[in-house]
Curated annotation (Swiss-Prot):
Composition bias type Low complexity, residue spans: 85-97
Compositional bias segments (type: Basic and acidic residues): 37-48
Residue segments, region Disordered: 35-100
This protein's name: Putative uncharacterized protein LOC400692
Length: 123
């Protein structure tokens, strides 16, 4: 697993398993089925892009402060797409910020701009 601090070089490791996915056990069958664990809110665990929040709101990652990776415009996400958060490099000067990664049809990219539930911009 590459060191996330290399994000300071402009590299976002969205094409790999995110450390948050791996550390939270989100791989294997659950990952193949598109399972999204919404972290510390019991009412939202297990939601995906296709259920109650609709396709514009995505999986909260454990340890990201309760935020979401949302895409703008909402049409950027379709049912079956996936997204997750990666912490930004501490050298970015904003330790609480993070990268939101988007997977569409198996192709992983950095989704930017994206907003957290609290209105902060993550990029």
């Amino acid at each position: 697993m590459p060191d996330a601090s290399l994000g300071s070089l402009g590299i976002t490791w969205c094409f790999l398993e995110s450390p948050l996915e791996v550390s939270s056990g989100r791989f294997g069958l659950a990952r193949l089925l598109g399972s999204q664990d919404h972290g510390d809110d019991p009412a939202e665990r297990g939601r995906t892009a296709t259920d109650a929040w609709g396709p514009s709101r995505w999986g909260q990652s454990p340890g990201n402060g309760g935020g979401y990776c949302d895409a703008s415009p909402p049409s950027a996400l379709a049912p079956g797409d996936r997204a997750w958060a990666l912490p930004a490099s501490p050298s970015s000067g904003a330790p609480a910020s993070q990268h939101c990664c988007l997977e569409k049809a198996g192709t992983r990219t950095k989704a930017s701009p994206v907003w957290g539930r609290d209105g902060n911009t993550w990029n």
